[in-house]
Amino acid sequence: MKERYNMTQNLFTEEELAKVTDRAERKHLIECAQDQSKIDLQYMKIMEKYDLWEKGSRSRYFHATTHENAEKIMQDGVIRKGMDGGVYICKQPLEAARFVAIRGHETGTIFEVELEDRKVFEAHDHNEEFFGCKAYMYTDDIPTAKVVKISRYSTKED
């Protein structure tokens, strides 16, 4: 049986790690596999350098935004990553909507997207207790080709 390094969602096989010829880079990948909070720009560059991204499982995630931003996303054909290097996503649609509602928007649009699990990691810059959920980050732009469903929502009380 092949040894696997588990990062909650991100897995490396021995063959994948064997591609990483630089010892320091391999060590960094293993450290990130053991502690996902260590994932950084260096990790992303190593993954890109050795073509380790687009393999493995995919899961559905949700990205919420305002209607205005949703229109721009559809025009541009992409959900662009932010200044912090990724696109914030959640595992449930209502969780994603909370991040828009907290900014004073009672209505919005939710994009359900299918993404490579290897490009997703927990974002530790959000207070889980405050938001009532974990936030995740996808480490690249999300082309609208990865959108499976678009829904409008409202948090207004009737």
Place the predicted regions along the sequence by residue.
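ADP-ribose/NAD+-binding catalytic cleft of ART/PARP-like enzymes
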Residues: Y5-G85, A101-I102
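Short, flexible beta-strand-to-coil junctions
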Residues: A64-A70, K91, V113-K119
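Short, intrinsically disordered low-complexity segments
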Residues: I89-T107
